[in-house]
Amino acid sequence: MSNKKIIKIIKLQIPGGKANPAPPIGPALGAAGVNIMGFCKEFNAATQDRPGDLLPVVITVYSDKTFSFVMKQSPVSSLIKKALGLESGSKIPNRNKVGKLTRAQITVIAEQKMKDMDVVLLESAERMVEGTARSMGVDVE
């Protein structure tokens, strides 16, 4: 791949196993000249074990219209909602609290996300998770 020139990098968030040519995937990939169905099939095959999880994906498009993609961990807010069984965060986070995260849950989420975060210490990742939780109206132990 060293002789291929990168022409575009596309960042999307797609539910696992549910990629289809409809917006936002189709227009983003179509504008770059990528085979949309080829991407959808590859992505769905790679994410069949994580159905419904919102997954950030970075798609690299090369000059010969081929592509490669890298999946990242779900966003922290999605992991918090999943851990607490929430549909969404609070509309007024400083007044209305929608749940409470335990220290153990924070540690698990931080460990999952650490490879995507620019942190070295687990404690730093935990503080980032706590900040996201507070901004969603979730109490932190």
Curated annotation (Swiss-Prot):
Cellular component annotations (GO), alphabetically ordered: cytosolic large ribosomal subunit
SUPFAM superfamilies with a match to the protein in the record: Ribosomal L11/L12e N-terminal domain, Ribosomal protein L11, C-terminal domain
Xref: InterPro entries: Ribosomal_uL11 (IPR000911), Ribosomal_uL11_bac-typ (IPR006519), Ribosomal_uL11_C (IPR020783), Ribosomal_uL11_C_sf (IPR036769), Ribosomal_uL11_CS (IPR020785), Ribosomal_uL11_N (IPR020784), Ribosomal_uL11_N_sf (IPR036796)
GO molecular function terms attached to this record: large ribosomal subunit rRNA binding; structural constituent of ribosome
Ribonucleoprotein is among the record's keywords: yes
SMART domains: RL11
GO-annotated biological processes: translation
Keywords tagged on the record: Methylation, Ribonucleoprotein, Ribosomal protein, RNA-binding, rRNA-binding
UniProt PTM: One or more lysine residues are methylated.
Gene3D superfamilies in the record: Ribosomal protein L11, C-terminal domain, Ribosomal protein L11/L12, N-terminal domain
Signal peptide bounds: none
Cited PANTHER family: 60S RIBOSOMAL PROTEIN L12, LARGE RIBOSOMAL SUBUNIT PROTEIN UL11M
Function: Forms part of the ribosomal stalk which helps the ribosome interact with GTP-bound translation factors.
Description of how the protein assembles with itself and partners: Part of the ribosomal stalk of the 50S ribosomal subunit. Interacts with L10 and the large rRNA to form the base of the stalk. L10 forms an elongated spine to which L12 dimers bind in a sequential fashion forming a multimeric L10(L12)X complex.
Family membership noted in the UniProt record: Belongs to the universal ribosomal protein uL11 family.
Name of protein: Large ribosomal subunit protein uL11
Source organism of the structure: Chlamydia trachomatis serovar D (strain ATCC VR-885 / DSM 19411 / UW-3/Cx)
